[in-house]
Amino acid sequence: SLEEVHHIPGAFWPVNEWSVKNVDQLYAINERMVMVFRTAEGERFAMVMVAATNVGAIRLAFDARFDSTKRPSGRKGLKVRYGRDSLRSDLERASGEYEDADPIHLKKGDEAGLFAMGSSVVLLMDQNLATKLQLSKEKLASLIGRPVQVGQSL
């Protein structure tokens, strides 16, 4: 289940070989959408969609509030927690933080979001979850730099 999403405004450096080697903390300074999931077994992992030059449009398939082409004044971020009851609507609109009672459940292969032109996705998980998913260091290394399509098995 999807637990929360964070839109983090940032820069739009190109995500190419030169930038990866020369721009310190490139993936941390570019604009990002961070989705935090919890598996049925309770393990958490994060999927980070990283914007880049010419790829400033990140949209989420399940929540229209997350559309990085809409630039709020002052470039404020946005955060939503799903599966929680909340009556803070006025405060939420002012702070950019929301809590939704309805949980979001994505099945394996479901579309989570899209880039208008494509960019980088970073998956963060602990070693135990990687082992359960049979993602060895060798298998992960073989995926570096390769394009991945929606629904494609890793």
What name fits each language-model region?
Residues S1-L154:
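Contiguous, well-folded functional domains in the mature portion of proteins
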